[in-house]
Design a protein with these regions (language model features):
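Sec-dependent N-terminal signal peptides
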Residues: 4-14
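Sec/Tat signal peptide C-region and signal peptidase I cleavage site
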Residues: 14-22
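Compositionally biased, intrinsically disordered low-complexity segments enriched in polar/Pro/Gly
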Residues: 21-24, 90
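Short N-proximal segments of mature Sec-exported proteins
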Residues: 26-56
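Active-site-surrounding "flap" and adjacent substrate/cofactor-binding loops of secreted or lumenal enzymes
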Residues: 52-74
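Alpha-helical ligand/cofactor-binding cores
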Residues: 69-86
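Low-complexity intrinsically disordered segments
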Residues: 81-189
């Protein structure tokens, strides 16, 4: 069921918004990148064509975290959602037009809250720092964050995504050296 919904979503994004595009016209610029970002961040198996869309999406940063989330959401909303998929086509795969609209809006909102990509490569770069003081001497300790962000969990649980979350295989202890090792891995590694 998830794959058929993801397939219809892909078809929907490839299709045009009848209010903004004419038949056969391709999406370009940020509109194209926004649609690609939604599709690429909805699955863990990503082709190389995803790099520019994901890079563009995560390059959107504001001074305040809530402003970053809103700016990323606005970027994702550039992707047309009035995709002209008729009720009969949606009914064939067991969803109605309201479910399709709510599912797409929910997916875009979920993606907009991602602080970074949910891949082992990104998770291994998320380092926590702690200052420990004892007898007037302080030192800084480090570790790679051992917890998966809630946004990654929400994305994996969304009905329209096919996400295999990485697993943590590291030591949760704090170290004096800045971590250069990996602790997050794909489950099949």
């Amino acid at each position: 069921m998830r794959k058929s919904i993801l397939s219809i979503l892909a078809i929907a994004f490839i299709a045009q918004d009848t209010n903004a595009y004419t038949l056969g016209e391709e999406l370009t610029g940020d509109t194209k990148l926004a649609c690609e970002a939604v599709l690429c961040l909805s699955t863990t198996s990503r082709p190389s064509e995803c790099k520019s869309a994901i890079k563009r999406y995560f390059s959107i940063k504001m001074r305040k975290p809530h402003k970053t989330i809103q700016a990323r959401l606005n970027f994702l909303k550039l992707c047309p959602t009035n995709v002209g998929v008729d009720k009969e086509t949606l009914a064939k795969i067991g969803i109605d037009e309201y479910e399709q609209a709510n599912g797409l809006n929910g997916l875009v909102t979920t993606i907009s809250t991602l602080p970074y990509d949910c891949t082992p490569e990104s998770l291994n770069k998320q380092v926590e720092r702690r200052r420990v003081c004892q007898d007037k001497e302080c030192e800084t300790l480090y570790r790679i964050k051992p917890t998966l962000p809630k946004a990654c969990q929400n994305l994996a649980q969304h009905q329209w995504t096919i996400i295999q979350l990485p697993e943590y295989r590291g030591d949760r202890s704090w170290n004096k050296e800045y971590p250069t090792y990996k602790v997050w891995f794909n489950k099949d590694q």
